Regions:
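Short, surface-exposed beta-strand-loop junctions and turns on beta-sheet-rich folds
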Residues: 34, 58-60, 135
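Short, structured beta-strand-loop surface elements
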Residues: 56-119, 123-125
Length: 142
């Protein structure tokens, strides 16, 4: 349980995976030559990895240059918000049997573009936080 003095709590690994699996839109952070690029992607959780589809372009080029990535998703309801961050290595899926496996996840592009490459993020660490909503506590300190 969270009180007003500690509205932020850390999630255990299982809860972080549960929240990650319950969402469909996240943000992929990839290092580029000029900084960190952040891409919104729809995704699916497959075991302890994250899978998304992409097309040729900046996202795939960045992943080929540097496979270390950070992935974030969040969710919220009336009483709390959640943020989950996963870190790992990303690689295009090239094995035919693995492609068939990830195709079965039902990932479809949200926009009408051709995205023929599946990418798997092999998660090496995952963390999450819960933010309990409440009234602005500033009055308490006046």
């Amino acid at each position: 349980m969270t009180n007003i003095d500690s509205p932020v709590t850390y999630l255990d690994t299982d809860k972080a995976w549960d929240i990650l699996a319950s969402q469909r839109l996240g943000r992929l952070g990839v290092q580029s030559d000029v900084g960190v690029d952040i891409f919104p992607v729809n995704y699916a959780v497959d075991g302890e990895s994250i899978v998304f589809r992409t097309a040729e372009g900046a996202k795939l080029t960045s992943l080929c240059s540097n496979s270390l990535v950070t992935f974030e998703t969040d969710s919220w309801n009336e009483i709390a918000g959640y943020s989950v961050v996963a870190k790992g290595h990303a690689a295009p899926v090239t094995d035919e049997a693995e492609i068939a496996q990830v195709e079965a996840l039902g990932l479809r592009p949200w926009v009408p573009t051709v995205k023929t490459t599946f990418v798997r993020i092999y998660v090496t660490s995952i963390s999450g936080r819960k933010f309990s909503f409440g009234q602005d506590p500033i009055e308490k300190y006046r």
